[in-house]
């Protein structure tokens, strides 16, 4: 019930206004968000790479309904990618892109998002790195996978995210478990109806393991996005005889575990930055009770 309430709050303009106006919120947000500027993001990226971890950067923003904002997001990614190359970080730092941030919600959104994603992929290719398409709520899944297919004709290294809580995802994993494919498997963090998503955690966990087996048995590059100790152990066992896979974890979550895993496995940190942090932040609170406890404890003790 608490998770449902928090996910509802993630889409509430009134809740957003209240949280963003609270002076004590921003210092806590910085546990999960690198900062507001590209310089903030570059500094944290360099530190993470120096610790033996790779990075995927997310310029925060979603559900854009203004063409100028979508264009600004593309420009921000192009600037970021140029700077990653200039600072020698591109070999270990890619970007993650939400299609709703680059025009998917606009009229003729599939075309607009594809054109803008192409521009970002071209900038990534010039920088010597890659792009992963983030997955959002289930209404965008088909459109996102359609854009993925189009992009991979010119940029075969483009990755995608699949969410284990959706009932369709095991088949999507089968469809994408081919040579050259990069798939980030996560559990999912949006409020979804039971008609399309498993409502119980135990069902989501079982789905995650089924999907993980499909990806590990396939010819692609699995990207195992989880903080769950049980899923980490299962992934390590399933992947022990193959080198071409990685763990992915969120910035600010289980840092010590990230460092431990990085001693024996490839680990990539999902690193968001920018001013549009509200939706991302609230979904992180909803995912793990420990995150919410940290937030409330920080507010009380400041």
Where are these regions (language model features)?
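Positively charged, amphipathic and often flexible ligand-engagement surfaces
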Residues: 1-302
């Amino acid at each position: 019930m608490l998770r449902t309430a928090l996910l509802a709050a993630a889409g509430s303009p009134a809740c957003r206004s209240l949280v963003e106006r609270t002076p004590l919120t921003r210092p806590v947000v910085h546990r999960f968000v690198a900062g507001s500027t590209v310089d903030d993001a570059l500094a944290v990226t360099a530190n993470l790479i120096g610790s033996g971890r790779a990075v995927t950067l997310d310029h925060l923003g979603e559900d854009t309904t203004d063409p100028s904002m979508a264009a600004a997001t593309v420009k921000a990614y192009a600037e970021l990618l140029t700077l990653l190359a200039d600072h020698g970080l591109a070999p270990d730092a890619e970007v993650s892109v939400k299609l709703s941030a680059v025009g998917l919600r606009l009229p003729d959104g599939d075309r607009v998002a594809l054109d803008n994603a192409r521009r970002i992929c071209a900038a990534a290719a010039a920088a010597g790195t890659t792009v992963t398409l983030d997955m959002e709520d289930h209404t965008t899944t088909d459109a996102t996978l359609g854009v993925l297919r189009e992009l991979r004709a010119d940029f075969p290294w483009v990755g995608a995210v699949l969410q284990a809580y959706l009932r369709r995802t095991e088949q999507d994993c089968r469809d994408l478990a081919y040579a050259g494919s990069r798939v980030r498997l996560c559990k999912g963090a949006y409020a979804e109806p039971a008609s399309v998503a498993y409502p119980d955690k135990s069902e989501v966990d079982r789905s995650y393991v089924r999907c993980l087996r499909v990806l590990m048995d396939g010819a692609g590059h699995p990207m195992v996005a989880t903080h769950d100790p049980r899923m980490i152990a299962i992934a390590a066992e399933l992947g022990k005889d193959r080198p071409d896979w990685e763990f992915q974890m969120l910035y600010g979550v289980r840092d010590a575990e990230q460092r431990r895993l990085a001693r024996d496995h490839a680990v990539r940190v999902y690193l968001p930055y920018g001013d549009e942090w509200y939706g991302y932040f609230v979904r992180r609170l909803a995912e793990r009770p420990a995150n919410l406890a940290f937030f409330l404890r920080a507010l009380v003790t400041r």
